[in-house]
Amino acid sequence: MNWRSERIWVEFITGSRKISNFCWAFILFLGSSGFLLVGISSYLGKNFISLFPPQQILFFPQGLVMSFYGIAGLFISAYLWCAISWNVGSGYDRFDRKEGIVCIFRWGFPGKNRRIFFRYLIKDIQSIRIELKEGIYTRRVLYLEIRGQGAIPLTRTDENLTPREMEQKAAELAYFLRVPIEVF
């Protein structure tokens, strides 16, 4: 969802709360729980999973390795669930022509850098830069080129905008900010 008026443009950025992250976290949790359960059942010699008897899987080395994979998968799943609950990467880009300020805000992981906030003057914006790399790993990213600061990405690398959508977004933003467009 974006909001735009004559002098202010606010673009909201989705973070970790995407359907794909929910799916991966859920699948990883189920799979790693299964691996850990098989490892524990082979260690104890009891049948916790009715698909096969525990005597078919020896604890050393198969049960031990499956337990390790299960524990590692649970840690990765917990990391994904934490990133989803904290909504890491979400935020907004606010372009305010009235005040002459660009504000970029993102949520990070808890700690010192939980709130990531950048503020620049519009007069310091050199250009809007489009980076297009086609091939097996396509990459289409929109950057805000700031004098003395370098380039700041405005779109995520996994956003998958078509070249036409990318050009349209860059043209609208460049027109709004009254800066040129560069293509790399």
From Swiss-Prot:
It is a multi-pass membrane protein. It is found in: Plastid, Chloroplast thylakoid membrane. Pfam families: Ycf4. Signal peptide: none annotated. One of its GO terms (biological process) is photosynthesis. The keyword Plastid applies. Keywords: Chloroplast, Membrane, Photosynthesis, Plastid, Thylakoid, Transmembrane, Transmembrane helix. The chain crosses the membrane at residues 21-43, 63-85. GO terms for cellular component: chloroplast thylakoid membrane; photosystem I. It comes from the Eukaryota. Belongs to the Ycf4 family. Seems to be required for the assembly of the photosystem I complex. This is Photosystem I assembly protein Ycf4. The lineage of its organism: Eukaryota, Viridiplantae, Streptophyta, Embryophyta, Tracheophyta.
